[in-house]
């Protein structure tokens, strides 16, 4: 049985009907509220404040007022805030994981991963203030010339429901660590995992008032955040359709924007692959967190000589993976996040079968629980081949030559993650180097991310930037060139 002891970060009295931040860094009543529904049980888990554009306008102004003092704080003092926030996430992790599992519908192992990665991101952020912040440049005698990293000012963060804690913290931590203030708008379906747990941790860690504002909201709040005059950068993680709107709106105001969007990711299985290993990787990539991951294995492109046997083994796994309430700690898959998303998944499966795909397993659901589904004979032009599904669907397409596998993998507007499994690493690498994706994994599946790697996609998967690891300084600061003369000199004018 999961540990259900109370955790100080889980405080319903703090966030019930409230938002976080303001000028004094406290919880304050919102004009509107929203129920948070547990996907597995359909029961109300919490009731939180819901931000509207006027709330966003106040929050961005308050963040802008607090930012200069935060950026000027001694580096060691800023670093200590992140270490204390990390310690808050490292305490009673089982209780945090259980809450995240209930709010997101993800299994406990996934929730435990979120808590651990959030703490790691904070530890990494603690090192940012103590790193070199610039370069000394060549200059003529009597003149000092250097370039330094300076914060954008206020960074607006819009985060999704699927991995809410990690995908919020991935932007919040480095943005704060580089001297910015942050206004965070988590998805209103997962406002606690994606926002208020972070607020509680930084509140406990002693982050100065006003530097972090957390306001769950809908699309109107997101648009207000993008357009707010005080916001210098937007970090958005979510669907390509929503990201395109964010990018267009940010472009009108000439704002920097980081877009981490969807994917249609291919796993290529070569004819010399170990099929037990390949089936295990394909199942994880397609079914983990019910396929609600931007890196999910949306296509399994298998050599024709092994496609039937790989399908058989994948079907066997799909039929035996337990589906149910993730809070039980005994299931491999939980629920889809909401009914609209479930119907979208089912519509893609049905349309693909009508177009000639073979339903080998699954394709059924009860409430929000969609069975792991295997489709074979999937071809280009079918919805299961072309579209991001965001559900637990393994779509298998055969190929005859390596060139055909490459062409099938690249036949998409997305470009996030690809993987190749085979006995010959040289052959797998030769294929991988011709795949158009931001992430490439050899002898692994497509779902992989660590705190230290640059993460970003091509095409419709993003705007060709990256976040994480060495990319964060580039994303959350900008260069300022500074020259200094001891005495002002005359000019030709």
Which residues does each predicted region cover?
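Structural signal for hydrophobic packing residues in well-ordered secondary-structure cores
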Residues: 67, 71, 86-93, 97, ...
């Amino acid at each position: 049985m999961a540990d259900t002891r109370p955790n100080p970060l889980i405080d319903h009295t703090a966030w019930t009907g409230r938002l976080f931040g303001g000028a004094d860094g406290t919880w304050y009543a919102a004009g509107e509220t929203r129920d948070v529904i547990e996907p597995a049980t359909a029961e109300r888990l919490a009731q939180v404040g819901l931000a509207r554009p006027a709330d966003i306008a106040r929050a961005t102004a308050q963040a802008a007022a607090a930012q200069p003092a935060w950026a000027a704080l001694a580096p060691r003092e800023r670093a200590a805030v992140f270490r204390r926030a990390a310690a808050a996430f490292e305490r009673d992790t089982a209780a945090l994981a259980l809450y995240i599992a209930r709010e997101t519908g993800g299994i406990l192992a996934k929730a435990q991963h979120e808590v651990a990665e959030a703490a790691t991101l904070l530890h990494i952020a603690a090192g940012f203030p103590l790193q070199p912040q610039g370069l000394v440049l060549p200059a003529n005698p009597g003149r000092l010339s250097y370039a330094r990293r300076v914060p954008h000012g206020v960074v607006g963060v819009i985060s999704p429901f699927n991995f809410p804690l990690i995908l919020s913290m991935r932007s919040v931590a480095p943005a704060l660590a580089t001297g910015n203030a942050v206004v965070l708008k988590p998805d209103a379906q997962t406002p606690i995992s994606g926002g208020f747990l972070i607020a509680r941790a930084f509140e406990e860690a002693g982050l100065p008032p006003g530097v972090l504002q957390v306001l769950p909201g809908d699309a109107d709040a997101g648009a207000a955040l993008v357009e707010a005059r005080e916001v210098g950068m937007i970090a958005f993680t979510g669907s390509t359709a929503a990201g395109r709107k964010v990018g267009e709106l940010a472009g009108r105001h000439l704002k920097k924007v980081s877009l981490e969007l969807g994917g249609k990711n291919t796993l290529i299985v070569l004819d010399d692959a170990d099929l037990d290993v390949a089936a295990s990787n394909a199942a994880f990539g397609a079914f983990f967190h019910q396929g609600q991951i931007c890196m999910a294995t949306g296509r399994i492109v298998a050599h024709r000589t092994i496609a039937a046997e790989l399908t058989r083994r994948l079907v066997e796994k799909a039929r035996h993976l337990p589906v149910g309430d993730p809070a039980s700690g005994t299931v491999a898959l939980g629920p889809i996040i909401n009914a609209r998303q479930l119907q979208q998944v089912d519509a893609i499966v049905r349309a693909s079968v009508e177009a000639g795909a073979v339903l080998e397993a699954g394709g059924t659901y009860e409430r929000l629980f969609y069975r792991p589904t295997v489709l074979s004979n999937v071809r280009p032009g079918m919805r299961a081949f072309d579209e991001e599904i965001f559900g637990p669907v393994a779509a298998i397409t055969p190929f005859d030559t390596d060139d055909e596998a490459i062409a099938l993998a690249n036949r998409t507007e997305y470009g996030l993650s690809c993987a190749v499994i085979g006995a010959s690493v040289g052959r797998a690498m030769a294929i991988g180097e011709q795949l158009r994706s931001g992430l490439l994994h050899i002898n692994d599946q497509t779902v992989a991310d660590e705190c230290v790697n640059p993460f970003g996609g091509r095409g419709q998967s993003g705007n060709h930037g990256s976040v994480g690891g060495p990319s964060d300084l580039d994303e959350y600061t900008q260069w300022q060139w500074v020259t200094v003369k001891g005495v002002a000199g005359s000019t030709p004018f």
